[in-house]
Amino acid sequence: MNFDVVIIGGGLAGLTCGIALQEQGKRCVIINNGQAAIDFSSGSMDLLSRLPSGQKVENVYQSLDELKLQAPEHPYSILGKDQVLAKAQQFEQLAQSLNLHLEGSTVQNHERITPLGGLRATWLSPNSVPTVKHLTALADKQVAILGIEGYHDFQPQLLADNLKQHSQFADYEFTIGYLNIPELDYLRQNSREFRSVNIAQLLEHKLSFQDLVQEIKQAAGNAKAVFLPACFGLDNQDFFNSLQQATGLALFELPTLPPSLLGIRQHRQLRSRFEQLGGMMMNGDRAVKAEFEGKNVARIFTTSHQEEPISADYFVLAAGSFFSNGLVAEFERVKEPVFDLDICGCKNFDSSDRFTWTNNRFAAPQPYQSAGVVINSACQVQKNGEVVSNLYAVGNVIGGFQGIEQGCGSGVAVVTALTVAEQIGGTK
């Protein structure tokens, strides 16, 4: 099999890159081994929330110069701030065309409310997710937080208690309630099946939609704003929007314990657009080895195609980090298993020295989380110190940053993905 571009990994980075390449007329295939990190995400996307020093970021553009001084190995520092902002804005346009219902701007981060009642700075959030801006706009300062009877992946009382700890919400009235939803009685019999995805699947046929509407209105009481667990609408936000329109209330949804419906929706919509554009998905397959001709990758082999190689002009590594086996930790070293590429990390990290992989403080950022492949300003990778000109890396497989601690995982994914699409599109 021969393609213009082979993309290894079907998460946020791989699909974003694939969509951009298909729009340029390239023939792409995505080798997808299973669920991606986006299926477990909050649905909000971070561009840069915190500098390595711990300083909070409000204006990303102004903070990128300081980031380069503190972390010259960070992918943003390597690409340059103008490229980072340009590709972030390009993704905003892509998200709008996909109808992902995302709100936010590269101009300034906003604060979203987390399921535990915390406030987290972020770049883009679904418009159904509550933010500080949403709450401060409420005239009556009354919010009903509604859970679902028997559903333990969302805790209304804990959320309310923690929100009251924030000074801006100290005078707000948070009321607690629970929805019964008789349709879910079958799931309640087995707690392991009582998850957000199962709930959404049972409710999506709208067999008792009006009963659900009335139950929400009754449980909300006098409150005009309602927080719900993200359990309503599996493929997209249409079910939730219909629910909001029918109740006449300002409904908001918060992500639950994984799997996260908000992330799953985004994943499905990205994948649908890629396939609509003619892209090919090889699901349940995994790249296992590659063959080189000279200094370039010629072909790869997968678990399902060990005798029939897949060749292409360009290859994009979007396999993610340890979570999805894009990186593997052996006793002696951290390695990238398909191409055996050069590995880097943040300061003081050495991929061949286990003692540099962890921090003595459990809650501190762990150095191994910054491990990943080495890239240049075009996102081309290195092997044995030399650039592989037709092999690129995107997303969390890249080294040199702490995606969780610095709040930049999603941003690195889409910025590098669109950078690679630009590089490949401009070279052929």
Swiss-Prot record:
InterPro entries: FAD-dep_OxRdtase_2_FAD-bd, FAD-oxidoreductase_2, FAD/NAD-bd_sf, G3P_DH_GlpB_su. It comes from the Bacteria. Belongs to the anaerobic G-3-P dehydrogenase subunit B family. GO terms for cellular component: glycerol-3-phosphate dehydrogenase (FAD) complex. Its cofactor is FMN. The gene is glpB. One of its GO terms (biological process) is glycerol catabolic process. Pathway: Polyol metabolism; glycerol degradation via glycerol kinase pathway; glycerone phosphate from sn-glycerol 3-phosphate (anaerobic route): step 1/1. One of its GO terms (molecular function) is glycerol-3-phosphate dehydrogenase (quinone) activity. It comes from Actinobacillus pleuropneumoniae serotype 5b (strain L20). Gene3D superfamilies: FAD/NAD(P)-binding domain. This is Anaerobic glycerol-3-phosphate dehydrogenase subunit B. Composed of a catalytic GlpA/B dimer and of membrane bound GlpC. Pfam families: FAD_binding_2.
